[in-house]
């Protein structure tokens, strides 16, 4: 049996707020108080998390005190620089800007700030994944081999991040590298025929609550170790407190029947391949 507590891992989906945002909200007592770069760094050795990928939220009010996309990207860059080689970060989207301006901001994020991909959160932007606004972003990412992470935790078939919207998008951009966050939640079966990677952030404890361990193991087997990516969504979770997230993940994953080689693919191999690290 693989022991996920001691297995080296890259957490491919965490949330960290800039120091300036924490300083501007000193009385915050919600989960975002845990989204602290320095506190997270101190946790990494204990959890055997070798590296982590910071995901923005398509919400400039959370990721800067200037509320601009350029400020968000600068903050993400500074987080990467604070602990070199330990953190990666994906570019944000601010749909107050035109698609052309968004692509320009992504170019700057990659070229000047060395960010590592693009994050789209259709529920936060209010723009459906397959809407025309996103065309220029996907086209740029496909042409420049930039990975895209898509939030997909839909509660209906017409949700902005619904699985069938992802299927449509993948058909339109056949060479795009895509990671589906939260595995498309309870629409995961519609994503089985696709080539998209799946990060297991947030959703894994939900699956166990709904399906039980054995069926959760079966659905992960259907998706395949070559597509699954270890991720937590720390510090956010619908049912767990921040302090409970990693322990819950390790307990669940320890009950899966992945081989050592498969576990290593999920824990760090697939994301390192995507990020070329």
Protein language model regions, located:
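A cross-domain feature marking catalytic cores of carbohydrate-active enzymes
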Residues: 14-16, 56-57, 91-95, 119-122, ...
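Conserved, mostly hydrophobic/aromatic
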Residues: 13, 44, 76, 109, ...
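Divalent metal-dependent hydrolysis catalytic cores, especially in the metallo-beta-lactamase
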Residues: 27, 31-64, 86-94, 116-117, ...
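Active-site environment of divalent metal-dependent phosphoester hydrolases
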Residues: 17-20, 59-62, 95-98, 125, ...
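Mid-to-C-terminal alpha-helical segments outside catalytic/metal-binding sites
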Residues: 1-17, 21-51, 224-227, 241-277
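Catalytic pocket-lining loop regions of alpha/beta-barrel enzymes
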Residues: 116-117, 131-229
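Active-site gating/metal-coordination segments in enzymes
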Residues: 66-149, 155-156, 204-206
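Short, acidic/polar
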Residues: 34-44, 97-110, 215
